[in-house]
Design a protein with these regions (language model features):
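Intrinsically disordered, low-complexity regulatory segments in ankyrin-centric signaling systems
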Residues: 9-41, 48-51, 67, 71, ...
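Ankyrin repeat structural motif
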Residues: 29-37, 62-71, 96-104, 126-134, ...
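Alpha-helical adaptor scaffolds
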Residues: 111, 115-135
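Bacterial N-terminal signal peptides
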Residues: 1-9
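Ankyrin-repeat-protein effector appendages
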Residues: 13-20, 136, 169, 178-181, ...
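Ankyrin repeat A-helix N-terminal signature
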Residues: 23-28, 56-62, 90-96, 120-126, ...
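Ankyrin-repeat boundary/"N-cap" motif
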Residues: 16-21, 46-52, 80-86, 112-117, ...
């Protein structure tokens, strides 16, 4: 009977800890999260929406808690939300370069099938983060499920600077997605004149110039 009471009390305590943990993450309450982890709460526990605490901390954002979670030994740095996004992908959306670097240092996947962090950073024109990903061997022409590349995303949604960065780093402007569209087509479709001019200038500069034939003597 005593054992049953102890176990029941433990289950109620853990239920309370479960709620407290995710509320504390949302509130960026690093003190409470730290206390719960020291009591043995599993850092990789998912919330009621099957979302990992690290994903929640980055999405909120709750930067202090995110750093605390990253510092734990058993943290999973590659969990996915229901949309298939990882912590590094969310950090790439928000342009959180310092956090992205820590994620990479802990083993976060820079390359993965489908949408990749570089797609996200390029979409939002986060140049510093784009450079970080490329320095860690992000595949520059990564293909999304519809075969769109980071350059295409930058051309349609990002900035001319993001387009220029990718082109100068070796992105292929001639690639086409599943709809047969190139990065230039993306820029035109979105009425992005700055991206159109950037891609056109790059293509023109790399096109071999015709050599004028010498006049017969």
């Amino acid at each position: 009977m005593t054992c049953l009471v102890v176990l029941t009390g433990y289950s109620w305590a853990m239920a309370g800890s479960y709620d407290d943990f995710f509320i504390a993450i949302k509130n960026d309450d690093v003190r409470l999260v730290s206390q719960l982890l020291h009591r043995g709460f599993d850092v990789n526990t998912l919330n009621s929406e099957a979302e990992h605490g690290l994903l929640l901390a980055i999405r909120e954002p709750s930067p202090k808690v995110a750093l605390l979670l990253l510092g734990t030994e058993k943290i999973d740095v590659n969990p996915r939300n229901r949309s298939g996004e990882t912590p590094l992908m969310l950090a790439s959306i928000k342009g959180q370069t310092a956090l992205a670097k820590q994620l990479i240092d802990k083993g976060a996947d820079v390359n993965q099938p489908g949408w990749a962090p570089l797609h996200y950073a390029s979409t939002y024109g986060h140049l510093e983060l784009m450079n970080l990903l490329l320095e860690h061997h992000a595949y520059i022409d990564a293909a999304s499920p519809n075969e769109s590349t980071p350059l295409m995303m930058a051309a349609m949604y990002g900035t001319a600077s993001a387009v220029k960065l990718l082109l100068e780093a070796g992105a292929d402007p001639m690639l086409r997605n599943a709809q047969g569209l190139t990065a230039f087509d993306f820029a035109e479709k979105a009425n992005r004149s700055d991206a159109v001019h950037t891609i056109a200038a790059f293509m023109s500069a790399r096109t071999p110039k015709a050599i004028e034939p010498k006049a017969a003597e």
